[in-house]
């Protein structure tokens, strides 16, 4: 049976688009890094907060908190936005609007969306460093 014949036409067009116009290798590597990091961190936080601590739903809250703390150089955002967090957010928006996005996104986006956004803005090296720190802390 020809599988293409049973796929919705919209999906066929999407697949053909990727076959004709493949993504750059660097972008593919970044996407793989993002997916791997997301899987690892969600797994670690789920085991710690849901399995060990029994606190349903707290895993994603702590993950977001730790991502922001890492990006803000260990300083709570209420004490100010550090240069590293500003640099990360300038990958997404104009430098003079960083403060607005950092604080405004808390009111308008879900926790999962904020986590996806932060991890997506991190470079591959920043994701690897974050995972290394998280594993070191959890294994204590």
Residue ranges of each PLM-predicted region?
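Short hydrophobic alpha-helical "box" of cullin-RING ligase substrate receptors
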Residues: 7-19
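Substrate-receptor adaptors of ubiquitin E3 ligases
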Residues: 26-140
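A detector of helix-start/N-cap boundary segments at the beginnings of structured domains
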Residues: 1-6
